[in-house]
Each structure stands twice: as C-alpha cells, then as structure tokens.
Amino acid sequence: MLVTPARDEAAGIVETMESVIGQSLHPVRWVIVDDGSIDDTSALVNCRISGLDWITLLRRDSAAQPGDFVSKVHAVRAGVRALEGIGYDFIGTLDADISLELDYFKRLFRAFEQCPSLGIAGGHVIEAYDGRLVPQRVSANSVAGGVQMFRRQAFEDVGGLRPMRLGGEDSVAEILARMRGWQVATLFELQVRHRGRALSGSARPTRAWFARGLVNRSLGYAPLFQLSVSAYRAAVQPPYLVSGLAMLAGYAWAALRREARALDPDTVAFLRAEQRRRLLRAVTRQPEPVRCAG
C-alpha cells in the first residue's frame, strides 16, 4: 500500500505517477491525497488514473501553507484510513516530487523478505537540480521521509506518523521503530530521484537549517551529538559553514527557551544512547552495523 500527500504538485506529479505505474511490481493500492491544492494537481491525477482501479484520488480540504508538517501528516492519515478493510503487509509514503527506478518496489520488497527484522526501509535519494545529480547524505540506519516503506507490524508498533508542529515525523517513526527492535535502513543500491533540493534547497536555506536545529532539540538530541552533526554539516553541506552554524543556532535557541520535548524521557534516553554509540564508532573509526542479510 502506498500513500502520497500532494499539495500544488502539478509541475511534476505526472512524472511521479508514471514511475509508479510503470513498476514491474506496483502497490496493491495507491492513495494520492490532494491536501488543498490550488493548482491543477487533482485534474492531472484524475486524468492519469482513468482505468487504473488500484489508484485512488482523495481530496482533502486544507488551509495548509507550504511547509505545514502537521497538515501533511493528517493527509497521510486520511490516506491510511481510506485503506481500512484492505489486507496488506506493507505501507509506505511517497512524496509527490519523487521518481523511482522501474524495478524499485520489486527490489525493495526483496530486501524486506530477506530480513524479517527490517521494519522501515527505502531507497537513497538523489537530488536533481541545476543539471546535477547530488546524493543526499543520510545515515545507514535512517530513511528519507519521502520514501519510507513500513512493514505493517512496525507501522502499527509506532502508531503511524505523529503530527509534529516543527516537522521530524519521519525521524520520530524511525526512533520508535528502532526502540521496539526493528531495523531501519536506507538501501543505497536503490536510487530514487528527487526533483529539486530538499532541506538545503529552501528559498531561505539558512532558515531551513535553523529549523532543523529546532527539530533536533525537540527530539532530544544530546548537545555533544548536535555539535558534531553541526560541524559535519558545516563542512560538507552547502551553504558551507552557514548550514552547520544555523542548525546549531536553532538548537541553542530552543534550549535557551526551554522548549518542550516532543518525545517522552524513555525515548529520549534511547536516542541519546544510540547517539553515544555512533560518536564512539566515529572516534574509533568502526563501521556502521550492517543490516541483516537473511
């Protein structure tokens, strides 16, 4: 099962649809949720799904603005509700600006088959902009929110996606899944194309990185880990230096204001224990744990 939240995606949603429709193994059902578009998104989707009874368009009235993370989660939830009563083993989200290789789902589900403890997985996002293809930098035990596929039991274990005012709902799902014993993995051998830039492609990238710092503080990132992440981003992520400093500033600002955590103390403790292990591996140059192969 697949759910795609879409708002004002007329410029590229047909390309996304073609990449799913042409799959060698396509989802049993795909719900595209128009989250209050004011462009031709719905008209284009309606035109393309004619005769394809496994794809449903769901219109949702919404006064959401671009970047409204809560509205996006509610759109996904509306799509999930539309699938009630239908048997399925996997459920995933796919952003409306993503294109997939034609054997993507076949290879993705093969990975789930080979690893019973794999709870969330997805391909490696490649950003296409300015005539370039730029791989997103992502941890091996994390998956970009726009391509997260859940084993059904893992999805139910974490309670689905949680509305987060600042964003980070995909990170919360991953943390809770790992806490419950599920593996989470980006499959680097599976590439997916994102049209344009993601976080770094904001019209105001400094503000976007500041916001990411706010999110990290709300999730309970340990100060030392956040400092190391900020230093890394400053070195490798355009705009260089500014990206890391802006992220650190967002984290510090939220800390000084004593902003409430989005996660409970036990979950924060689990996350920080993970982060300590990651820092230790980085210092001792140990490789990331490899996901199971069978």
Question: Language-model features: where?
Answer:
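Short beta-strand-to-loop acidic/aromatic patch adjacent to the donor-nucleotide binding site
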Residues: 87-99
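Non-catalytic, C-terminal membrane-associated alpha-helical segments of glycosyltransferases
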Residues: 208-294
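Short, acidic, metal-binding catalytic loop of nucleotide-sugar glycosyltransferases
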Residues: 18-27
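Conserved donor NDP-sugar-binding/catalytic core segment of glycosyltransferases
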Residues: 99-134
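Short beta-strand/loop segment that forms part of the nucleotide-sugar
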Residues: 27-36, 58-60
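Active-site nucleotide-sugar/metal-binding loop of Leloir-type enzymes
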Residues: 73-90
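A conserved acidic beta->alpha catalytic loop
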Residues: 34-43, 98
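Conserved nucleotide-sugar donor-binding
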Residues: 144-159
